[in-house]
């Protein structure tokens, strides 16, 4: 075991959530209930997973907190921004994800979380009509206002560290523009020039967080920190960044099942995925421009796992789209289901001598129940990374994300294979804990 330089998790950790809707309030309520011994944080890797450290006779399995100094749940303080002014208790009741009996025991704590005014541009989420919005004339004013929010929250709550995580709606798609998004100076100039076409509000949150010494996590598929200018800022401020898009339901299944097809050397003709979802996220994604952003995130999973150029007999012939497998993703807004998302996958595969077979997957899940532990894990592990001196893209957090960040300017591919991602996660924890990384089967 090596000596590590990870700083201890002393003092309070402020978790500032962009968005105070279903996901955020389910996360907050679960943490509060767990702290009181009234619930268990099931689904959280940081609270339940055990990693093998050492080999042979020295082998043992330990919780993350026994390997690295994680922040304690008792030390977490929540803050939030939202376009709607309702406090976290009111928002949790409105979302109807959790039963009233699971919210009321921590009503007093939830009521104290009153969302700050959001940095918002309705053109980026046309289906939202909240009025709890900052009056900013330019994108740079948004940045300055958000920076002040972070400073004030940190001081007022006596926090020693802050992490900012996006749990708000999906913005419209913003194509990466080399003239704006590749260099920090150009990004800052565009913010100051109020370039609303190329500078999304989410970029203002990320810029504000990083410049205030807080890691930033993008939980939606927005174009935000997955641009070279933000990587430059993360390097400059020595802050971790992670993204993008929480991997909760259908894509989690896809990233776990696609490797089975690939490992078994089966062929793929097509994969059709569709969902019904009735919460506010579904409402926003019912807008075509916003769905386009999400579609890109959900489609990106297969192409790095089942590669046509590596196995042309199984997955197609290079760039010839007529012979590649067909991959389609759809999300349908269906209010009666609220947060209880349902996903269907039809997978057309083929085996020995080309004979066809099918796989059908029907996942009836609860969107926010699956997302809440991801917020806990991503915030705690990003805080850990910052204290360990890790900055820039945190690839070891790919396990939790649909479209993991990677340096596409250098031809790097994202790692989407769930099992490879899990190895990356475990090895990062091992290394930060002073143990040797390895890829042995546990």
Where are the predicted features?
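Histidine/cysteine- and/or acidic
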Residues: 216, 240-243
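Conserved anion/nucleotide-ligand pocket segment
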Residues: 242-244, 248-319
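Glycine-rich, aromatic-lined ligand/substrate-binding cores of catalytic
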Residues: 293, 297-393
């Amino acid at each position: 075991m090596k000596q590590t330089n990870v700083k201890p998790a002393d003092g309070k950790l402020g978790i500032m959530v962009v968005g105070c809707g279903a996901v955020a309030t389910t996360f907050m309520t679960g943490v509060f209930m767990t702290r009181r011994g009234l619930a268990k944080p099931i689904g959280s890797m940081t609270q339940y997973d055990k990693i093998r450290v050492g080999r042979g006779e020295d082998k043992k399995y330990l919780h993350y907190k026994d390997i690295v100094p994680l922040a304690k749940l008792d030390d977490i303080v929540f803050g939030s921004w939202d376009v709607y002014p309702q406090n976290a208790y009111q928002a949790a009741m409105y979302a109807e994800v959790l039963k009233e009996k699971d919210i009321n025991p921590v009503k007093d704590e939830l009521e104290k979380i009153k969302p700050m005014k959001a940095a918002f541009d309705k053109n980026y989420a046309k289906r939202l009509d909240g009025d709890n919005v900052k009056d900013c004339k330019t994108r740079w004013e948004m940045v300055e206002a958000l920076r002040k929010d972070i400073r004030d929250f940190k001081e007022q709550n006596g926090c020693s560290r802050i992490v900012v995580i996006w749990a708000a709606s999906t913005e419209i798609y913003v194509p990466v523009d080399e003239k704006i998004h590749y260099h920090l100076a150009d990004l800052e100039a565009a913010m100051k020039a109020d370039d609303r076409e190329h500078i999304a509000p989410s970029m203002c949150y990320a810029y504000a967080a990083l410049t205030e010494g807080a890691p930033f996590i993008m939980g939606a598929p927005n174009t935000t920190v997955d641009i070279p200018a933000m990587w430059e800022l993360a390097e400059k401020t020595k802050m971790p960044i992670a993204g993008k898009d929480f991997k909760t339901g259908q894509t989690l299944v896809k990233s776990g099942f696609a490797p089975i097809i690939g490992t078994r050397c089966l062929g793929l003709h097509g994969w059709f995925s569709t969902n019904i979802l009735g919460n506010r996220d579904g409402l926003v994604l019912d807008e075509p421009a916003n769905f386009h952003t999400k579609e890109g995130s959900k489609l990106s999973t297969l192409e790095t796992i089942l590669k046509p150029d590596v196995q042309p007999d199984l997955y197609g012939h290079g760039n010839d789209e007529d012979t590649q497998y067909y991959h389609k993703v759809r999300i349908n807004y269906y209010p009666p289901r609220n947060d209880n998302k349902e996903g269907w996958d039809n997978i057309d595969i083929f085996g020995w001598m080309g004979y066809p077979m099918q796989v059908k997957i029907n996942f009836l899940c609860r969107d926010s129940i699956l997302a809440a532990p991801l917020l806990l894990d991503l915030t705690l592990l990003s805080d850990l990374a910052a204290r360990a001196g890790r900055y820039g893209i945190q690839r070891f957090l790919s396990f939790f994300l649909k479209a993991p960040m990677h340096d596409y300017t250098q031809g790097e591919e994202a790692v989407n294979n769930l099992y490879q991602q899990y190895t990356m996660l475990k090895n990062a924890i091992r290394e930060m804990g002073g143990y040797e990384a390895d890829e042995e089967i546990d």
